[in-house]
Amino acid sequence: MKHKKKLIALTAVCALLAYWLYPDQHPVYPASDHYDPKTQTFFNPEPQQKPTGLTGAFWKILTDPQATRPPKPLPTVKPDWQTFLAAPEGKSRFVWFGHSTLLMRIGGQTVITDPVFGNSVSPIPITMKRFQPAPAEIDELPPVDVILISHSHYDHLEKDSVQALNSKGNSHFIVSLGMGVLLKKWGVPQERITELDWWQSTERNGIRYTALPARHDSSRTLTDHNQALWSSFAIEHGGEKFYFHGDSAQGSHFDKIAEKFNGFDITFIENGQYSKHWPNNHLFPEQTARYAAQLAPKRFMPIHWGAYAMALHAWNEPLLQSLPLARSLGVNPLTPLMGQVFDADTATQDWFAEPLQ
């Protein structure tokens, strides 16, 4: 029995090493201002500063959870699916599940962004655990028409969530260029995958999706760094326009996006997981507020917070710092509870600033 257990353990270790050390084969794409066919990797037109002090930063995150995690469960509500699905034409509705996972009801279609429902967003699953369960599980969701994924990092692309959604029906995946290789490996048929390069668009059932630049990176293993692209997205239907930020540091691409779209109904912009140790990977709170103002939305909703601690700041620090500045710049924030059905006109409270009950 002991030998059998050792053999099983050895097999598991070998499988994990094979996954990490042997990369998937990606197509070679045409050369561009953000892709090098010689190295078969994407890059940022504006170079990133290399992260520093990662070991110490992540060790503090792991060993001092009181500094980064809420002391009590965050308030949530169970989604009212009847209200969500009854979104009238021109009045899209949304549900936030924490971090960057949003369910959108637009033009009679249901769209989910960066679906991550798992307990951990780390390749080492005992780390970076979710603060609490999502307000609903995947099995409780209404049928999903489109799955929109910005990039391949674990907190935006989760194998279990992808496979669970894929098994529920005929959802179509719209993803950044290069991500199809992994999705097909996980069982998603080629005909249900659309990959987009920056500034490319696709239309499904009257909804237009456009991949937009971001300043970030991608990887899941030791050997696949930047083999898939990272993007933000514009989503347009009728007279409505929404912006889903994904992950991105500050850059000149924001100017181009603002000029191209001339305002949005709601911008969903990352507001969390920043650090001086990785200054060119995420927006700092002041940058989030200024970028939100630059995009001229009716409402700005901070995302990329509320579910996982992946940086050294307190769980609510991003909002406490960004929202006062956003308001001073004329931006109207939107801060629903996780699970709450909301739209561009929903009145919300700064619940994150109050003591947790």
List each language-model region with its residue ranges.
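Catalytic core of the metallo-beta-lactamase
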Residues: T101-R105, E203-G263, P279, L283-Q287
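Active-site metal-binding motif and surrounding structural segment of the metallo-beta-lactamase
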Residues: I126-I174, N262-F268
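Conserved G/P- and acidic residue-centered "switch" motifs that form tight phosphate/ATP-binding loops
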Residues: D114, H151, D247
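Short hydrophobic/aromatic-enriched beta-strand-loop microsegments
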Residues: T113-D114, F173-I174, Q190-W199, D265-E270
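Acidic/histidine-rich helix-loop elements
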Residues: P115-A134, D217-D224, S275-N281, A309
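Metallo-beta-lactamase
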Residues: K2-S122, I126, A134-E137, L177-F244, Q321-V341, D345-T346, ...
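Cap/insert and terminal regions of metallo-dependent hydrolase folds
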Residues: Y22-Y29, Y35-P37, V146, H153, ...
